[in-house]
Amino acid sequence: MKRTSTASPPYAPRRPRRAAAALAASAAVLAALLTPATAGAAPAPAATGAPLPTELEVIRAAEATALYGDPAERPLDQRKTSLISLGDSQISGEGVGNYEPGTDGPTNWCHRSKDAAVHRTTIPADVTYNVSCSGANSANIRIGGSPQYADELVQSDNLAVKARNTRIKQVLVVAGANDDLQFGPVMTDCVTRYLLLQGACNPKYGPGWQARVDGLVPKVTTTLGDLKKVMADAGYTEGSYELVLMSYSSPITPDFRDNPKFPGKLPGGCVGYDADARWGRDTAVPAFQKGLRAAARDAGATYLDGSRLFQGHEVCTDDTWVRGLTVDLSHPFPPDANSVRQSFHPNGRGHAAFAACLSALHGTGLREASCADPGSTGQAVLRAGAWDDAFGPLRAGTGVCLDAKGGDTLNDTALIGWDCTGTRNQGWWQSPDTGAVHIEATHDRCLDIPGADYRAGRSLVLYDCKGQPDQKFTRTGATLRPAAAPDLCVTLTGKDTPARLQNCDGSAAQSLA
């Protein structure tokens, strides 16, 4: 099926533009870094929707004429099918390049890429729409909200138009980072503090982070409810389309030095303190993810957990799906806040991963699903359920839990027995497909037998998940055994003692509940 990637047409200004204050180039590069630049049969939808306000009806008629040759609102069975994405820079294509005309400055910086995920899925559709915009918050999406730029519609209004001209199959939403969380300004501050040698930023933001998450959840919930109302007003019934909220993945990792070709923080674009990278991955993004999951549940939307999707592919890794710190001194010129706006956003490979997840999710009927690279494959794989429900401790009968020593996740981190704390360096999940045992802190590190040395007494470590035999384990009762050496068991004898392979003997140290 030939698919049309449709750029959002320009609209008559709805309110005066605000003049942007000129900034000194060097100050703008630092201060503006990452600041938001802003299954089963379903009831058939109604033939046509409720009338639109006059202003939107004019736009609808013009778009219908472009699609079909005349302005009539067609019955659903006579319409082209479509997909649509709404939200902020995470899904607009910020950082990918190849931006739609009119969205790459100087008066509109939505940065909608022609290579954004919505245009790259394998879901059969005649038309794909990307109405998301870099910097959008819930006020730019919800009913009665405000447009970001004079030539933009509120995103829910854009949805209302598209829903009456096409038969929408999937509505993708990625939103929340620019509400109370202010993820961009926080990232800006963290990077700026590093460049100016001012110390890590996580002590500043950590204590109030959960309150920020709690503040954004009702806004995202309301926004999703508004989008459902828009679809209902357009004649759609529950279940006749998919409403998907996808969560964000951390663009940074503290494990970048495991990249054998690590070029350095500045050349690689992964500027920031290691402690902040660890806080972002282990605390900030997981808390944000939990909030978005709650919003999707409360609104009755499908939840796609993307929180682990970029793990192993962050900035400065050997196969990055994220653009690092990027400063474009020529566009605009002289440089201003927009010179760095592409930094720390998904690149083309990141959007290909989004598209793979969305394609796999379509038509499954799942209310919750999650997506990640199963182990340095370069491919995104979907699984049913959210990641939060997958991980749990491996608690030995001796009373200790399998623990990544010091909370580290670098290659060759020692694994030990330790007091059970419920932290992410003690959470584990075994893939039913590969047998690999992933640690909760990052999907890119697995339980590993160094050198495939299958002998009693061999200590175990964390290592880059690679799908090799030395990372494949089986469960026999409560024991965990190497698939290649089933007479050996993972053994935890006590606190601060190494996790080792020992001959299986039925002891409490080998009973991992």
Regions found by a protein language model. Give the residues of each.
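Short, well-structured alpha-helical segments in soluble
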Residues: 144-166
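Serine-esterase "nucleophile elbow" of acetyl-processing enzymes
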Residues: 62-134, 191-192
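Extracellular glycan-recognition/adhesion modules and their associated mucin-like linkers
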Residues: 379-410, 424-454, 470-496, 511-513
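Alpha-helical cap/lid subdomain in secreted, periplasmic
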Residues: 160-328
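C-terminal region of N-terminal signal peptides and the immediate post-cleavage residues
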Residues: 31-71, 367-368, 459
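Structural recognition of the beta-strand scaffold that forms the well-ordered cores
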Residues: 82-94, 127-132, 169-174, 179-181, ...
